[in-house]
Curated annotation (Swiss-Prot):
UniProt name for this protein: Small ribosomal subunit protein uS4
HAMAP family assigned: Ribosomal_uS4_B
Species this chain originates from: Geobacter sp. (strain M21)
Gene: rpsD
Pfam families (alphabetical): Ribosomal_S4, S4
GO BP annotation list: ribosomal small subunit biogenesis; translation
Length: 208
């Protein structure tokens, strides 16, 4: 399945929820879902009864789009989560949260996960002192993500770090803004994920 390259705001309207795909725009009145809180398309404002399967599918699509994951990779994450100890749905969210691109976004180095993914791919970071360019890499407690010296003058990164206060940083991460450095203090817990996600619906979908 190819990666979606169309309007990001259209995805938010389709899922009926803010996915925060457009960075700072999502926090302003320009946010599409604040202006038109109904699905896109000719019949977007009509009322359509959705089946249980449809509800489960929409939830899966919503989470997949929040984190920018393709279907095959997302299914792989679910299978990994299902083999782990604990609650499968929560395990899935923890795997997604521990992706390196998500951590870069959570720390405020980028205004969106897509932007963070590009920064990682282009080699702007080091992890524990070594250059890294794999967005899907799973971080662990004690890992240190730092912006490389030559990247610290990139205006977009500096502006994003200045605006991170509005978004907030999860308890399991710590940012040293002056050092352009973030530390993974612990593994995420369910309470750290404040987005309106019903992960059990995804478990039910894949368990059919």
């Amino acid at each position: 399945m190819a990666r979606y390259t169309g309007p990001s705001c259209r995805l938010c309207r389709r899922e009926g929820s803010e996915l925060f795909l457009k960075g700072e725009r999502c926090y302003t009145d320009k946010c599409a879902i604040k202006r038109r809180s109904y699905p896109p398309g000719q019949h977007g404002q009509g009322r359509i009864k959705v089946s249980d399967y449809g509800v489960q599918l929409r939830e899966k699509q919503k989470v997949r789009r929040i984190y920018g994951i393709l279907e095959n990779q997302f299914r792989g994450y679910f299978e990994t989560a299902d083999r782990m100890k604990g609650v499968t749905g929560e395990n899935l969210l923890f795997i997604l949260e521990r992706r390196l691109d998500n951590v870069a976004y959570r720390l405020g180095f980028a205004t969106s996960r897509d932007e963070a993914r590009q920064l990682v791919r282009h080699g702007h970071f080091t992890l524990n002192g070594r250059k890294v360019n794999i967005p899907s890499l799973q971080v662990k407690a004690g890992d240190v993500l730092q912006l490389r010296e030559k990247s610290r003058k990139v205006a977009a990164i500096s502006e994003s770090l200045e605006g991170v206060v509005r978004r907030g940083i999860p308890q399991w991460l710590e940012l040293e803004k002056d050092a352009f450095k973030g530390t993974v203090k612990a593994m995420p817990v369910r309470e750290d994920i404040t987005m309106p996600i019903q992960e059990q619906l995804i478990v039910e979908l894949y368990s059919k």
